[in-house]
Swiss-Prot record:
The keyword Thylakoid is assigned to this record: no
Major subcellular location class: plastid
HAMAP family: HisD
Any GO molecular function: NAD binding
EC identifiers of the protein: 1.1.1.23
GO biological process: L-histidine biosynthetic process
Protein's recorded name: Histidinol dehydrogenase, chloroplastic
Gene: HDH
The record's free-text note on cofactor binding: Binds 1 zinc ion per subunit.
Cofactor(s) named in the record: Zn(2+)
Function comment: Catalyzes the sequential NAD-dependent oxidations of L-histidinol to L-histidinaldehyde and then to L-histidine.
Domain of life: Eukaryota
Length: 473
């Protein structure tokens, strides 16, 4: 996920977490450009360990002032419910709503252009196929005779899915979040997305929502939408877990609410979108530039990193392509600003290149080198990996089948992207026979005695006494 007009991604593990100040990057600029797409350049062999470590730091997001804005919204929605959501929708979206929530079952089928419908149908099928394959069979293990243990799977009963509006419509995010919820069997699925100026919802988002089993649509965005799903209102069901992207205010609301009395969890912390591209001399400069820009265009806070692996790479051709393509993009101004705080790294070989990538832990990792598949085993930290010259990051964003809600800000070191598991919970079950308790009980009683927990010990020994009495009789 990312703080962009689109998918959101990880940034802070708890509402109490504020990112530490970023270490300054080494001032070893090897090349500059007067183009709209200038990127700083560094050679790893010339940097100290501290300087290399500084390159992994992301631009800092200061949530202190944002919390001051979001907290009153969270509390207002808690107290006034639908009325507060309507007021904030007028204030921020300039829309006066009659109804905040609509039931998807009450909506008519959505008519789309045939080519658009086919594209989303293909995406749905691929996303469904990949996520349904993640189902695991239940297994029962008999650890010792008469002692059986297993883990059973249950869905999270109610979930909230946030699909941003902003400067771009994102029906792809509706699929990425709703399809695994559908497979998991979540009974209540609330999709929140900002309404357009006439109070309607993007028809492509509605099509995807209906196809993927969404039950309710909340016509609201921002912190007020997150708050409505977390607290519940007269018209909006309360959810148990909230997923999805958003701007800094959406992220702040998720951070605040996950440790509040609302008792709601969130998918992951979130920060700006990012990509790291590893390219060797065989990579097509046109493709490399396009991949860098596909992330940079998300917004000025996005970050792109180019890692040049080995000798023979025509960096000048890549820079020229970046400048050429950037100037032709409708969102070129966003891309240019993002490139202004992005950078290029020179690695002596692929081992050093992937080692740097593992330290950086990117949301998206593109390995555009000859025989890319052979390097997969070295990858330790990345949200999603794209191997080879024919695998642009865009396919993962839309329709290859993998999920595009991914950890950013370096959280790929310890977080995974959204998957079927994100919508499931696992419950352990144990069942002992009389023989099983006779075998295991004395050991449990002894451990309880060591820990000084007499009631624990007696829960076992009293049963063992009953067993012995039965045997004696």
């Amino acid at each position: 996920m990312s703080l962009r007009p689109g998918r959101a991604h990880p940034l802070a593990a708890s509402p109490l977490h504020t990112p530490l100040p970023a270490r300054p990057r080494p001032q070893l600029r090897l090349s500059t450009s007067t183009s709209c797409a200038a990127m700083k350049s560094y050679r790893l062999s010339e940097l100290s360990d501290a300087e290399v470590g500084g390159l992994k730091a992301r631009p800092r997001i200061d949530f202190s002032s944002i919390f001051g804005t979001v907290n009153p919204i969270v509390e207002d929605v808690r107290m006034r419910g639908d009325a507060a959501v309507k007021d904030y929708t007028v204030k921020f979206d300039k829309v006066a709503l009659d109804d905040v929530v609509v039931r998807v079952s009450d909506l008519p089928d959505v008519e789309l252009d045939p080519a658009v419908k086919e594209a989303f149908d293909v995406a749905y099928d691929n996303i469904y196929a990949f996520h349904v394959s993640q189902k695991l069979p239940e297994k029962t293990v008999e650890n010792m005779k008469g002692v059986r243990c297993k883990r059973i799977t249950r869905c999270i009963g109610s979930v909230g899915l946030y699909v941003p509006g902003g400067t771009a419509v994102l029906p792809s995010t509706a699929l990425m979040l709703a399809v695994p919820a559908q497979i998991a069997g979540c009974k209540t699925v609330v999709l929140a997305t900002p309404p357009s100026r006439d109070g309607s919802i993007c028809k492509e988002v509605l099509y995807c929502a209906k196809k993927a089993g969404v039950t309710h649509v909340l016509k609201a965005g921002g912190a007020q939408a997150i708050s409505a799903m977390a607290w519940g209102t007269v018209s909006c069901p309360k959810v148990e877990k909230i997923f999805g992207p958003g701007n800094q205010y959406v992220t702040a609301a998720k951070m605040i609410l996950q440790n509040s009395e609302a008792m709601v969890s969130i998918d992951m912390p979130a920060g700006p979108s990012e990509v790291l591209v590893i390219a060797d001399k065989y990579a097509n400069p046109v493709h490399v530039a396009a991949d860098l820009l596909s992330q940079a265009e998300h917004g000025p806070d996005s970050q792109v990193v180019l890692v040049v692996a080995g000798d023979g790479v025509d960096l000048g051709a890549i820079e020229a392509e970046v400048s050429k393509q950037c100037s032709a993009l409708p969102r070129g101004e966003f891309a240019s600003k993002a490139l202004g705080h992005s950078f290029t790294v020179f690695a002596k070989d692929m081992v050093e290149a992937i080692s740097f990538s593992n330290m950086y832990a990117p949301e998206h990792l593109i390995i555009n080198v000859k025989d890319a598949e052979q390097w997969e085993d070295l990858v330790e930290n990345a949200g999603s990996v794209f191997l080879g010259q024919w695998t642009p990051e865009s396919v993962g964003d839309y329709a290859s089948g993998t999920n595009h809600v991914l950890p950013t800000y370096g959280y790929a070191r310890m977080y995974s992207g959204v998957s079927l598991n994100s919508f499931l919970k696992y419950i352990t079950v144990q069942s002992l026979s009389e023989e099983g308790l006779r075998s295991l009980g004395p050991h449990v009683a002894k451990m309880a005695e060591v820990e000084g927990l007499e009631a624990h010990r007696r829960a076992v020994t009293l049963r063992l006494q009953d067993i012995e009495a039965t045997v004696t009789v």
